[in-house]
């Protein structure tokens, strides 16, 4: 699991929640500009991403991650933010986020969402060899574009 948040206390909280659930293969960073390098070297099964960070926000990270994820792959990205407006949620989802949680976090809800995303990732990895890449790419092409609601 890769966690990116510019606030160290938020990273510490997420790491503690994950550790309590036995999830120890975690890499965290307060530097959103390093996300792609970490993603390429770590190959996470889940990315947990804060949206609003200085200099390089989570939306820019989402755009870059989307370009790196192959058509025959599925990487769940869980977005965390204090800005839970409809426009923010829709923009994040349109850019590839798979789920969205508002801050302050509820520990139980957060862990249930994380387990659901990890389960989906595991199922996808088990099935991706059965589905041609072209079919997945067609699904991605029909995804609505991000824009004003």
Predicted regions and their residues:
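Acidic, metal-coordinating helix/loop segments flanking the phosphotransfer/catalytic sites
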Residues: 28-46
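Alpha4 helix (beta4-alpha4-beta5 surface) of REC/receiver domains from two-component response regulators
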Residues: 15-16, 41, 60, 73, ...
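Acidic catalytic/metal-coordinating carboxylates
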Residues: 30-31, 57-63, 135
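The feature encodes the CheY-like receiver
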Residues: 54-57, 81, 85, 103
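Active-site residues of response regulator receiver
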Residues: 5, 50, 81
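C-terminal output helix
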Residues: 104-114, 118, 122
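Two-component/phosphorelay signaling modules centered on CheY-like receiver
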Residues: 8-27
């Amino acid at each position: 699991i890769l966690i990116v948040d510019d606030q160290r206390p938020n990273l510490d909280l997420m790491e503690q929640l994950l550790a309590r659930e036995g999830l120890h293969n975690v890499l965290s960073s307060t530097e959103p500009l390093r996300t792609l390098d970490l993603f390429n070297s770590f190959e996470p099964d889940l990315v947990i991403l804060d949206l609003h960070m200085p200099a390089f926000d989570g939306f820019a990270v989402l755009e870059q991650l989307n370009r790196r994820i192959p058509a025959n792959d599925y990487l769940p990205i869980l977005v965390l933010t204090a800005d839970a407006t409809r426009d923010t949620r829709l923009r994040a989802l349109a850019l590839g986020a798979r789920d969205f949680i508002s801050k302050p976090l509820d520990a139980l809800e957060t862990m249930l969402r994380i387990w659901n995303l990890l389960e989906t990732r595991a199922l996808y990895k088990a099935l991706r060899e059965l589905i041609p890449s072209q079919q997945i790419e067609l699904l991605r092409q029909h995804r609505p574009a991000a824009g004003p609601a």
